[in-house]
Amino acid sequence: MKIDTIRNFSIIAHIDHGKSTLADRLLEYTGALTEREMQDQFLDKMDLERERGITIKAQTVRLTYRADDGNDYILNLIDTPGHVDFTYEVSRSLAACEGALLVVDASQGVEAQTLANVYLAIDNNLEVFPVLNKIDLPAAEPERVKHEIEEIIGLDAHDAVMASAKEGIGTREILEEIVKKIPPPEGDPAAPLKALLFDSWYDQYQGVIILVRVIDGTVKKGDKIQLVSTGRSYEALKVGVFAPVMREVPQLAAGEVGFLIAGIKDVADAKIGDTVTHALKPCVTPLGGFKEVKPMVFSGLYPIDTAQYEQLRDALAKLKLNDSSFSFEPETSLALGFGFRCGFLGLLHMEIIQERLEREFNLDLITTAPTVVYKVHRIKGDVITIESANQLPPLQEIDYIEEPFILASIHTPNEFVGGILSLCEEKRGVQREIKYLTPTRVMIIYELPLNEVVLDFYDRLKSITKGYASLDYEHLNYRRSDLVRMNILINGEAVDALSLIIHRDKAYYRGRDLVSKMKELIPRQMFEVVIQAAIGAKVIARETVKALRKDVLAKCYGGDITRKRKLLEKQKEGKKRMKNVGNVELPQEAFLAILKVEEK
């Protein structure tokens, strides 16, 4: 196969702009799938991907296409995840391509995540050309959207392909553009093997399957290969391509995209962005851009039924097989029992994992409030990182605490700007800029503490803007902040699962809301229950759940006041004793309340 007949490309699009449907049409047109095999969103393998209409893992497929110039071309479509949490995975998938189709919904225009991914593509020197999808919709405004693409992204859009993936309009034109506009890969088949690993997953029969793009050299069955970041060697047991079902091939040469199965046991060894080379004759310099993915958001997962603990552990281990960016370790809580502390890339990643646990493994879970990674500088000069309030050292040992900040860019219709600005200010944001992209669309850029974003920022942004705003963020740095640990005390006992790290300025308001919410949820006992929010020894808010009491004076018709007083005193004594020995059962809702306390 000649290297100049290969085209490697990916499709960049915002959620719901029609990326997976377009991929379906390309598969159908090039005859990769028969009518019988065709199902909607063929490349999205997980039910969850189909349902939410998002792509979570990268997939590849090889198409063969006879172009108008009479030549046969091999087109490798690399399907990338489009969501902000998976930015690193996207950048590695894009590094495997020479070009990209920018698919924009002709009725909605350019969105924040599209923009982030286009910039990633441009950073990787990809040839990007625009495709306007959904032109069959009555609300489509192709001219306005073309103008937006030119204004916002700076791409020439006058000859953008008009398409409707649903109706199959424009599919052939797109294939022709791919052949004409995207350059063939460059690479030397005779050089030592150098290949980019851009995705991996676990198959229970064959071990870890890795997707690679060969940059230089060739790899064939039986070769000894090495992964550069770990230095471990394996034997290539199978070499092949997805067309779109797995098919073995004799070898993969420079410029080609395919899969390798090499008896790798653990997906954590096959790191995305790693370089694959020959063990005996390695390449001199590995590929650049590799970095270890670290979880940014942490949350505790506990089974509601403690008998499901083992099942939860097995389920987490299974998910980890396919997702090395997810981490978990056991933890115990006095209030919730045994569970796990899990680390995620971001909020969407967290939601997807929780939903998969509940759906695929039938588990009922309680999730504690999400937290981020803080850096605590201690007085003795060392720095420790913590993910939960319970790991915070005593106040007298702490010099200062740093928290992570992100740079958020929010795209929104202009009528919602006021609401978004006040939301960002309330979340301790620092305004960077406000840019009018078109007379009706605005881009707002803010620096925000990640701690404030993980709780409910995204939901509130969507409700303020009726779902029209889109959010994209990147991690900036760590900054010094006045953070404190707030404890919730029930009858003087701190409840570990309810502690949280919070900014001092907000602690009073949050504490007050929390204790009043808890007062509604804790059922009345035979003795009074005192709920307090405290920072260190200082109580900042308090509520009391009054005791239930029997009417002890019912049997005294008239009689002396001292008799009544004696009975009341006796009852009071009894209640006091009870309070010392009684313990309060906290209902499950009390923990969920913490997650749902809206900051006023």
UniProtKB/Swiss-Prot annotation:
Pfam families tied to this protein: EFG_C, GTP_EFTU, GTP_EFTU_D2, LepA_C
Any one of the GO BP annotations: positive regulation of translation
Catalytic activity of the protein: GTP + H2O = GDP + phosphate + H(+)
Enzyme class name: hydrolase
Gene Ontology molecular function terms on file: GTP binding; GTPase activity; ribosome binding; translation elongation factor activity
Sites where the protein binds GTP: D16, H17, G18, K19, S20, T21, N133, K134, I135, D136
Domain tr-type G: 4-186
Disulfide pairings: none
Main localization (coarse): membrane
Bilayer topology: Peripheral membrane protein
GO cellular component: plasma membrane
Gene3D superfamilies: 3.30.70.240, Elongation factor 4, C-terminal domain, Elongation Factor G (Translational Gtpase), domain 3, P-loop containing nucleotide triphosphate hydrolases, Translation factors
UniProtKB keywords: Cell inner membrane, Cell membrane, GTP-binding, Hydrolase, Membrane, Nucleotide-binding, Protein biosynthesis
Entry function: Required for accurate and efficient protein synthesis under certain stress conditions. May act as a fidelity factor of the translation reaction, by catalyzing a one-codon backward translocation of tRNAs on improperly translocated ribosomes. Back-translocation proceeds from a post-translocation (POST) complex to a pre-translocation (PRE) complex, thus giving elongation factor G a second chance to translocate the tRNAs correctly. Binds to ribosomes in a GTP-dependent manner.
Family from the record: Belongs to the TRAFAC class translation factor GTPase superfamily. Classic translation factor GTPase family. LepA subfamily.
Descriptive protein name: Elongation factor 4
The species this protein was found in: Geobacter sulfurreducens (strain ATCC 51573 / DSM 12127 / PCA)
Gene: lepA
